[in-house]
UniProtKB/Swiss-Prot annotation:
A Pfam family hit: DUP
Cytoplasmic side: 1-47, 96-237
Keyword Ion transport: no
Span list, region Disordered: 174-201
Gene Ontology BP term (one): vesicle-mediated transport
Signal peptide bounds: none
Gene name of the record: PRM8
Additional information: Present with 1254 molecules/cell in log phase SD medium. Members of the DUP240 multigene family are specific to S.cerevisiae sensu strictu. Cells lacking all 10 DUP240 proteins show no obvious alterations in mating, sporulation and cell growth.
Record's protein name: Pheromone-regulated membrane protein 8
Membrane topology: Multi-pass membrane protein
Alphabetic keyword roster: Endoplasmic reticulum, ER-Golgi transport, Membrane, Transmembrane, Transmembrane helix, Transport
Length: 237
């Protein structure tokens, strides 16, 4: 029998669902579960219904070409359809795996995790955040599997894409009050008339406040990371 730690290090090439041995103390990400990125990608594609249907059609067309290779008309028609369905498959793959998750609640939850856990650059906190965000996407039907982010660096890069190119004003409030205000608009909205005059209604956290606070945390740890790597470069920050 394998111990939990042995299970965590186990690798799998099959398309079967990997074992449920993800634990909070030593989370396993897709990079740890799958033998290679190719096997991970095949697993993800296999859980996309349009991809599977198109792959089945392409497989049938290839079989027809092989079986009836002496029939020029049959081969010609099959090759034509093969090219068409192959092109459609490429488009579906691009549309499925190309765009980033744009769900607002997902972004807010990610920012909440960053504000709460305060992950350092390349810190182990990113593994936990990545695992929790993968699970959130799966539980809320935003992704077909609990393995959206292949590794913690991918989740970190996704966060950086949210703040890249943005200009933030430094918040004067304390960290605790910032998070509290972002989590509860009811406490700061005042009366309905006051709310109508000062701000628009929001059913969830204040995204801009969350983004600003998370960006401040990232900037702080980026400075600390580079100062440790290259002492004496404070003038560049």
């Amino acid at each position: 029998m394998q111990t939990p730690s042995e299970n965590t290090n186990a690798k799998s090439d099959s398309l079967d669902e990997p074992g449920a041995y993800l634990i909070e103390e030593n989370v396993a990400l897709p990079k740890d579960i799958f033998h290679s990125y190719l096997s991970y990608w095949i697993y993800e594609a296999a859980h996309c219904t349009p991809v599977m249907l198109l792959s089945l059609v392409i497989g049938v067309l290839i079989s027809i070409i092989i079986l009836f290779h002496d029939n020029e008309n049959c081969v010609g028609v099959s090759v034509g359809f093969l090219l068409i369905f192959s092109g459609i498959l490429v488009i579906v793959l691009i549309l499925r795996f190309g765009p980033q998750i744009s769900d607002e609640d997902f972004k807010c939850k990610l920012l909440m995790e960053i504000i709460t856990r305060k992950p350092t650059v390349k810190g182990k906190e990113w593994r936990t955040i990545t695992y929790k965000m993968n699970q959130y996407l799966f539980d809320n039907d935003l992704w077909n599997t609990p393995y959206y982010f292949y590794r913690d660096e991918d989740c970190h890069r996704y966060f950086l894409s949210l703040i890249k190119g943005r200009t933030f004003k430094k918040q004067k409030e304390s960290s605790a009050s910032n998070v509290k205000d972002a989590q509860s608009n009811d406490e700061t909205a005042g009366t309905p008339n006051e709310a109508a005059e000062s701000s628009s209604f929001s059913a969830g956290p204040n995204f801009i406040k969350l983004l600003t606070k998370a960006a401040e945390i990232e900037q702080q740890f980026q400075k600390e990371y580079w100062r440790q790597e290259y002492p004496g470069v404070d003038e560049f920050f």
